[in-house]
Amino acid sequence: MSKSAVSPMMQQYLGIKAQHTDKLVFYRMGDFYELFLDDAVEAAKLLDITLTTRGQMDGVPIKMAGVPFHAAEQYLARLVKLGKSVAICEQVGEVGAGKGPVERKVVRIVTPGTLTDSALLEDKETNRIVAVSPDKKYIGLAWASLQSGEFKTKLTTADKLNDELARLQAAEILLPDSKNAPQLQTASGVTRLNAWQFAADAGEKLLTEYFGCQDLRGFGLDSKEHAVSIGAAGALLNYIRLTQNLMPQHLDGLSLETDSQYIGMDAATRRNLEITQTLSGKKTPTLFSILDGCATHMGSRLLALWLHHPLRNRAHIRARQEAVTALESQYEPLQCHLKSIADIERIAARIAVGNARPRDLASLRDSLFELAQIDLSATGSSLLETLKAVFPETLPVAETLKAAVMPEPSVWLKDGNVINHGFHPELDELRRIQNHGDEFLLDLEAKERERTGLSTLKVEFNRVHGFYIELSKTQAEQAPADYQRRQTLKNAERFITPELKAFEDKVLTAQDQALALEKQLFDGVLKNLRTALPQLQKAAKAAAALDVLSTFSALAKERNFVRPEFADYPVVHIENGRHPVVEQQVRHFTANHTDLDHKHRLMLLTGPNMGGKSTYMRQVALIVLLAHTGCFVPADAATIGPVDQIFTRIGASDDLASNRSTFMVEMSETAYILHHATEQSIVLMDEVGRGTSTFDGLALAHAIAEHLLQKNKSFSLFATHYFELTYLPEAHAAAVNMHLSALEQGRDIVFLHQIQPGPAGKSYGIAVAKLAGLPVRALKAAQKHLNGLENQAAANRPQLDIFSTMPSEKGDEPNVDCFVDKAEEKHFEGILAAALENLDPDSLTPREALSELYRLKDLCKSVS
């Protein structure tokens, strides 16, 4: 395509677009951002805006679409949510300053991971960008948040990469454009960069220059050992510099993160526990949404961070617990202060990248003064004392802003009225000229009326024609000779005089000069604030931590959460534990105990469908998780030993993108658990093996349970409908049978949701199907088939020889016939016990008692 065939403006556009082929270009033209050619077609489709044409290029109409400048943020937000990146091209030259189009250049690039504008961000979500740099053995990760200044790195392995990305909840992922780039479970938000940008040498050079140090050892990074992490961090910092068109000034150091800092949770566990997102992808009801009572958006974001990063350091946990206890008496006054605090964290980020607005500074000023008034004296908490000590450090910044910024400044700097009176003498003088213009005009009008004797004479102003003297048509002919005609209207004539023209020039010049000076002064204020960014970030973090801790304190009081105890020996003891989310969704929640220790490491959980097995297991995991955030827990008491990881294998779903069936997903997640769980891990296994044939599933479930008992030795909750597995406690002393109870009332079933010792008597599957609304005919047929299958299973005992090849804990072969007999005996005992439990002998008539006796006899025949 020949550039000579297009206009100079389009030549300019094509030159800019050639540098940003992978992005949409917002090209500023007056009060609009315009998009051209393929960008226009894509934007029109994504944003539902009008696609039109303007001019031609090589004989073809140029496609064009545009959005108003003042509404650009909402369109940018929509594009970013769709994973698009946008290059913002502004007019930087003066209109009419020379030949050709006005000078334009890309001033910033908006990408999903580098947002700072509040209109483009979710208030309660942290926006992170992650760089991934692989080598043959390890993968280096680096991530940053431009809103908080967070900048961290970590070494990981390929099998843990997707779990790390799930933990970080990356909005954008930077990958090298090479064949050895790792495979991700998500394709959205991925940006490919040239592989050389991840080079460790270049990364170390850029990082040492940025931090002003000779090497990175002070950050815990060794040039050889952490080469891939350094390469990732360097690529990330360079990408931020390119997109923001400047080097960020607020990244808070570079820290090396290790697995030992936090309790590990893989992607499946975070999903199954519904920490910040439900299984259906919604934001409520989740653990975060139920707990979040924070007064500030900073606090809400920190709460989500703590929930995804439960601590392992007991000293840090106890410090949080002590603060929660101390804040019980301080909650109300503290909340009054916190509710007045703006989002200091994000305001600081906008100051750092140069796009803070006047009202950002006013909000920052008011918030800093508010924080300085917080009184946390005599709390006895060292953590609270440390947090409070941060706030006085920002008072000089607040005083500077008080002097520099109007109490209620304009939204936009271009509208003026931003810099405070008395801050700069020259600005005050220019404003005086503007503001006292009304007095001059009134005096001039009175003087001219007296001089001319014309009663209809008025002195007025509008933005198009400036200042003028207006006379009615009838008196216009009597205008003095020094009146120069400016505009003719239907019923009036407008004039200008040398005196009025001189005043107009003075006022308009003063206005332009004042706006230019305000911009200069505002930029100076921002420059000074950048030197105070470390103090502002510390204040933001301290305010957020106070907010979360006070929220924890309120939860303890309002929802009867208790302070958990920590032990150095293996134990998970919970008295009357409750599911923190479910108990808020139902009228009555049944609390349950949990007892796991060195003697009992695996709880074999049986019971009816809808009986509450999954809820109970999640409840245990969530209580353990909450305890390690410093939050109190929903229970009467809790004691928890060392925990390194939490694993879950719950639910079923296909992975069509990876061509994996439901059963394949289940086995992959199970394999990961068996390879990584340790003696200090919490493992939840729900209905393992149900995705294949009955005996295959039973064999796998048995083998997995034994592996957890003998090899992993983790604290495991193992829910199953395979009643044959209930023999495990006889072969393995570390296993214990528990069940969720239910009560049959005639042909109906009542779920008691109560954990009780021993195996369940039956699954009540048909009763649950009845509750679901299956037709009566289908239910009767199911009952008939069930009776037949149970009789057939009893007659074909040799089919259960699948366990004959499995060694017991002692290494000998289990007696299969004995296993079958005992399992069936337990099954029969459970059914008989359930039937007897429903009888009330004192209320039966003789005839009813005889009838019940016959029914029990028939029941014995059906299961014998």
From Swiss-Prot:
Q: Establish whether keyword DNA damage is in the entry.
A: yes
Named from the GO MF annotations, one term is: ATP binding
Q: Name one Pfam family in it.
A: MutS_II
Binding-site residues for ATP, renumbered to this chain: 607-614
Question: What SMART domains does the record point to?
Answer: MUTSac (SM00534), MUTSd (SM00533)
What does the entry list under GO cellular component? cytosol
Record-linked Gene3D superfamilies: 1.10.1420.10, 6.10.140.430, DNA repair protein MutS, domain I, MutS, connector domain, P-loop containing nucleotide triphosphate hydrolases
Q: Which residues are connected by disulfide bridges in this protein?
A: none
Q: Which UniProt keywords apply?
A: ATP-binding, DNA damage, DNA repair, DNA-binding, Nucleotide-binding
Any one GO BP annotation for this protein = mismatch repair
State the source organism's domain of life. Answer: Bacteria
- Name the NCBIfam families for this protein: mutS1, PRK05399.1
Q: What does this protein do?
A: This protein is involved in the repair of mismatches in DNA. It is possible that it carries out the mismatch recognition step. This protein has a weak ATPase activity.
The text of the family note is: Belongs to the DNA mismatch repair MutS family.
Q: What is this protein called?
A: DNA mismatch repair protein MutS
Source organism of this protein record:
Neisseria gonorrhoeae (strain ATCC 700825 / FA 1090)
Gene coding for it? mutS
